[in-house]
A protein has these predicted regions:
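Catalytic cores of enzyme domains
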Residues: 33, 74-258
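Non-catalytic, usually N-terminal nucleic-acid engagement modules in DNA/RNA processing proteins
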Residues: 1-81
């Protein structure tokens, strides 16, 4: 038996739990991401997606990579906590709810190469009216620009949906494109995901794989020496943290919300 639960009650809980943004998108109008990750694949019978977001601290993401990565992990942990509370509210009312991890785990397959989550939080945020697309496929919020991390809860509760924003926020200033140190962003609006990944996650899975490949080819003495080098220490630290972000240049450069 289900209890009456309004979209406003659900959004207010997300805001009360320290989220700054919350909105609802209907599953039947949910935009298609590439590759397709429909909400029904997360929860069969899904009717609504509750998207919510937390702004990042500009001082933290503009600091050194250690401070920025630690801050990002803090925000992701908070997003997971909020999602669980929203899910509990929905299930206490008799509905089903599924939270999607804000970072890991990801599908590790030949098809996705660990680049695709079970649900696109950016598409959820845009569909729920929390932001609009930028030229380089960041989600822009009028108050915080692209400096917001999003997450979502999928539910079979038939909640009233919000309308996508029609506000034009991206001025095509090219500041994000010029700020990218590896040229991953283009004026045509495309993103070279691999270039971006190798810059953002220098000590992530690609870097770890290269280290192992090179390590096994070395003589035993050189292997032992490699384990006493800062490269291995950084790889270990990032594996232990479970998160790896070494670059926020495009987020810092965007003038929206500053």
């Amino acid at each position: 038996m289900t209890m009456l639960l309004t979209a406003e009650e659900v959004k207010q809980l997300a805001l009360k739990e320290s989220g700054e943004l919350a909105g609802v998108a209907a599953v039947n109008t949910f935009p298609t991401s590439v590759p397709s990750r429909p909400p029904q694949a997360v929860l069969p019978g899904a009717k609504s997606v509750i998207a919510y977001g937390i702004p990042m601290l500009l001082g933290s993401i503009s600091s050194n990579p250690r401070v920025a990565a630690s801050h990002t992990k803090t925000v992701y942990d908070e997003l997971n906590r909020i999602g669980y509370q929203v899910g509990r509210l929905l299930e206490r009312a008799g509905y089903h709810a599924a939270t999607v991890g804000s970072f890991f785990p990801l599908e590790m397959s030949k098809e996705t190469r660990g680049l695709v989550g079970d649900l696109s939080f950016r598409h959820a945020a845009v569909a729920a009216g929390l932001g609009v697309w930028s030229r380089c496929r960041l989600v822009l919020n009028p108050r915080w620009g692209p400096r917001v991390r999003y997450a979502a809860v999928v539910t079979d509760a038939p909640l009233a949906s919000d309308s996508p924003s029609e506000e034009e926020l991206c001025a095509d200033c090219d500041l994000c494109i010029r700020a990218c140190p590896v040229g991953a962003l283009s004026t045509e609006g495309t993103v070279d995901t691999i270039k971006c990944l190798l810059q953002v996650q220098q000590y992530g899975q690609p870097g770890f794989s290269r280290f192992l490949r090179d390590l096994v080819a070395k003589p035993i003495e050189e292997q032992q020496q490699a384990l006493r080098q800062p490269l291995f220490w950084n790889l270990y630290q990032h594996l232990a943290m479970g998160i790896d972000y070494e670059c926020s240049r495009c987020l810092e450069a965007c003038p929206v919300g500053l």
